[in-house]
């Protein structure tokens, strides 16, 4: 059985969006742009959640994204951490 130091999660979060071109204010869409990110939560504070895509046997990690917690809409655990 392999050990997993970090759980694997799926995060649905409201991302910022940009638009271009001439438009009037009435045509602007108020719908959230929902992004989906899957990764290993390697740090969490009151304001942010850091996910890494990869970690090694010494628990060093790479390819991180820092998501503001106020933008998180749903968090699903896909695989729980396992201690060896």
Predicted regions and their residues:
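Conserved RNA-binding domains used in RNP assembly and mRNA/RNA metabolism
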Residues: 1-84
């Amino acid at each position: 059985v392999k050990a997993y130091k970090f759980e694997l999660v799926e995060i649905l979060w409201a991302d910022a969006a940009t638009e271009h071109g001439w438009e009037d204010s009435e045509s602007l869409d108020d719908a959230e742009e929902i992004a989906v990110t899957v990764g290993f939560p390697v740090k969490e504070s009151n304001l942010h959640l850091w996910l890494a895509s990869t970690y090694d046997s010494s628990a060093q990690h790479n390819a991180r994204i820092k998501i503001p917690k106020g933008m998180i809409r749903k968090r699903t655990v896909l695989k729980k951490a396992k201690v060896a």
